[in-house]
Protein backbone atom coordinates (compact mmCIF):
# COMPACT_ATOMS: atom_id res chain seq x y z
CA UNK A 1 0.00 0.00 0.00
CA UNK A 2 1.28 3.43 -0.96
CA UNK A 3 1.81 5.76 1.99
CA UNK A 4 2.44 8.98 0.11
CA UNK A 5 -0.28 11.55 0.34
CA UNK A 6 -2.17 12.56 -2.74
CA UNK A 7 -1.71 16.10 -3.99
CA UNK A 8 -5.28 17.00 -3.01
CA UNK A 9 -4.54 16.06 0.61
CA UNK A 10 -1.37 18.13 0.62
CA UNK A 11 -3.19 21.16 -0.74
CA UNK A 12 -5.83 21.25 2.02
CA UNK A 13 -5.76 24.71 3.54
CA UNK A 14 -4.43 26.32 0.36
CA UNK A 15 -7.42 28.07 -1.12
CA UNK A 16 -6.73 27.81 -4.86
CA UNK A 17 -5.25 24.26 -4.90
CA UNK A 18 -2.39 25.30 -7.12
CA UNK A 19 -4.53 26.76 -9.89
CA UNK A 20 -3.72 30.40 -9.22
CA UNK A 21 -6.02 33.21 -8.28
CA UNK A 22 -6.28 35.60 -11.15
CA UNK A 23 -6.33 33.35 -14.26
CA UNK A 24 -8.38 30.73 -12.45
CA UNK A 25 -8.76 27.06 -13.28
CA UNK A 26 -11.83 26.85 -15.45
CA UNK A 27 -13.46 23.66 -16.68
CA UNK A 28 -12.97 23.30 -20.48
CA UNK A 29 -11.69 26.60 -21.80
CA UNK A 30 -11.06 25.40 -25.36
CA UNK A 31 -14.07 23.13 -25.60
CA UNK A 32 -14.09 19.35 -25.25
CA UNK A 33 -12.19 17.05 -27.58
CA UNK A 34 -11.70 18.27 -31.13
CA UNK A 35 -14.03 21.24 -30.71
CA UNK A 36 -13.02 24.36 -32.59
CA UNK A 37 -10.96 22.66 -35.29
CA UNK A 38 -12.37 25.11 -37.84
CA UNK A 39 -12.33 28.05 -35.46
CA UNK A 40 -10.20 28.74 -32.41
CA UNK A 41 -7.97 25.63 -32.84
CA UNK A 42 -7.55 26.14 -36.58
CA UNK A 43 -3.79 26.75 -36.53
CA UNK A 44 -3.15 23.44 -34.77
CA UNK A 45 -5.45 21.50 -37.12
CA UNK A 46 -3.97 23.06 -40.27
CA UNK A 47 -0.43 22.45 -39.10
CA UNK A 48 -0.60 18.98 -37.56
CA UNK A 49 -3.72 17.44 -39.15
CA UNK A 50 -3.93 18.62 -42.78
CA UNK A 51 -6.85 17.07 -44.65
CA UNK A 52 -8.84 16.39 -41.49
CA UNK A 53 -11.81 18.37 -42.78
CA UNK A 54 -13.55 18.03 -46.12
CA UNK A 55 -14.40 15.23 -48.51
CA UNK A 56 -12.46 13.61 -51.32
CA UNK A 57 -13.57 11.29 -54.10
CA UNK A 58 -16.75 9.33 -54.52
CA UNK A 59 -18.39 6.93 -52.12
CA UNK A 60 -19.05 3.36 -53.33
CA UNK A 61 -21.98 2.02 -51.32
CA UNK A 62 -21.93 -1.59 -52.49
CA UNK A 63 -18.21 -2.21 -52.56
CA UNK A 64 -17.32 -5.89 -52.31
CA UNK A 65 -13.87 -6.15 -50.85
CA UNK A 66 -11.50 -9.03 -51.56
CA UNK A 67 -13.85 -10.74 -54.02
CA UNK A 68 -10.86 -11.83 -56.10
CA UNK A 69 -8.56 -12.57 -53.15
CA UNK A 70 -7.84 -16.29 -53.19
CA UNK A 71 -4.29 -17.30 -52.21
CA UNK A 72 -3.23 -20.45 -54.05
CA UNK A 73 -1.06 -23.41 -53.15
CA UNK A 74 0.23 -26.15 -55.45
CA UNK A 75 -0.23 -29.86 -54.95
CA UNK A 76 3.49 -30.47 -54.51
CA UNK A 77 3.60 -27.97 -51.61
CA UNK A 78 0.71 -29.51 -49.65
CA UNK A 79 2.96 -31.45 -47.29
CA UNK A 80 4.53 -28.21 -46.07
CA UNK A 81 1.22 -27.51 -44.27
CA UNK A 82 1.66 -30.65 -42.18
CA UNK A 83 3.99 -30.64 -39.18
CA UNK A 84 7.10 -32.84 -39.13
CA UNK A 85 5.63 -35.00 -36.35
CA UNK A 86 2.45 -35.71 -38.28
CA UNK A 87 4.44 -36.41 -41.45
CA UNK A 88 6.59 -39.03 -39.74
CA UNK A 89 3.52 -40.54 -38.02
CA UNK A 90 1.69 -41.19 -41.29
CA UNK A 91 4.72 -41.92 -43.51
CA UNK A 92 4.59 -45.73 -43.34
CA UNK A 93 1.27 -46.26 -41.61
CA UNK A 94 0.34 -49.99 -41.54
CA UNK A 95 -3.35 -49.33 -42.30
CA UNK A 96 -2.54 -46.80 -45.01
CA UNK A 97 -4.14 -43.94 -43.08
CA UNK A 98 -3.45 -40.40 -44.19
CA UNK A 99 -3.60 -36.99 -42.48
CA UNK A 100 -6.50 -34.66 -43.19
CA UNK A 101 -5.27 -31.35 -44.58
CA UNK A 102 -7.63 -28.37 -44.42
CA UNK A 103 -6.07 -25.79 -46.72
CA UNK A 104 -8.69 -23.13 -45.93
CA UNK A 105 -7.66 -23.29 -42.28
CA UNK A 106 -4.06 -22.82 -43.41
CA UNK A 107 -5.06 -19.64 -45.28
CA UNK A 108 -5.27 -20.91 -48.88
CA UNK A 109 -8.46 -20.74 -50.94
CA UNK A 110 -7.30 -22.18 -54.24
CA UNK A 111 -5.58 -25.49 -54.90
CA UNK A 112 -3.57 -25.90 -58.08
CA UNK A 113 -2.43 -29.16 -59.65
CA UNK A 114 1.27 -28.53 -60.30
CA UNK A 115 3.60 -31.36 -59.30
CA UNK A 116 2.92 -34.92 -58.27
CA UNK A 117 1.16 -36.26 -55.20
CA UNK A 118 3.66 -38.79 -53.84
CA UNK A 119 1.76 -40.24 -50.88
CA UNK A 120 -1.90 -40.61 -50.07
CA UNK A 121 -3.63 -37.85 -48.13
CA UNK A 122 -7.15 -36.81 -47.21
CA UNK A 123 -7.84 -33.31 -48.38
CA UNK A 124 -10.57 -30.87 -47.41
CA UNK A 125 -10.79 -29.25 -50.82
CA UNK A 126 -11.83 -25.61 -51.30
CA UNK A 127 -14.29 -24.52 -53.96
CA UNK A 128 -11.46 -23.35 -56.26
CA UNK A 129 -9.69 -26.52 -57.35
CA UNK A 130 -9.06 -28.46 -60.53
CA UNK A 131 -10.54 -31.80 -61.57
CA UNK A 132 -7.19 -33.19 -62.70
CA UNK A 133 -5.87 -32.47 -59.23
CA UNK A 134 -8.56 -34.67 -57.72
CA UNK A 135 -7.59 -37.45 -60.15
CA UNK A 136 -3.93 -37.17 -59.10
CA UNK A 137 -4.80 -37.56 -55.41
CA UNK A 138 -7.20 -40.47 -56.01
CA UNK A 139 -4.61 -42.26 -58.17
CA UNK A 140 -2.27 -42.45 -55.16
CA UNK A 141 -5.05 -43.64 -52.84
CA UNK A 142 -6.10 -40.35 -51.24
CA UNK A 143 -9.49 -38.69 -50.93
CA UNK A 144 -10.92 -35.23 -51.63
CA UNK A 145 -13.86 -33.76 -49.73
CA UNK A 146 -15.39 -30.40 -50.63
CA UNK A 147 -15.13 -28.05 -47.64
CA UNK A 148 -16.10 -24.56 -48.75
Swiss-Prot record:
Superkingdom in the source lineage: Eukaryota
Classification via InterPro entries: Ribosomal_uL15/eL18, Ribosomal_uL15/eL18_sf
Region of interest (Disordered), ranges: 1-37
Molecular function GO labels: structural constituent of ribosome
Pfam assignment, any one: Ribosomal_L27A
Biased composition (Basic residues): 1-30
Alphabetical keyword list: Ribonucleoprotein, Ribosomal protein
GO cellular component: cytosolic large ribosomal subunit
Family (UniProt): Belongs to the universal ribosomal protein uL15 family.
Annotated protein name in UniProt: Large ribosomal subunit protein uL15
Source organism of the structure: Tenebrio molitor
Amino acid sequence: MSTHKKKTRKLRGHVSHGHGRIGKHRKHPGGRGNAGGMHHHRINFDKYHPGYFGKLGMRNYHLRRNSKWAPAINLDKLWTLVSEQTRSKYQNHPEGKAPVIDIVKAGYYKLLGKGACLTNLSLLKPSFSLNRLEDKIKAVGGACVLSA
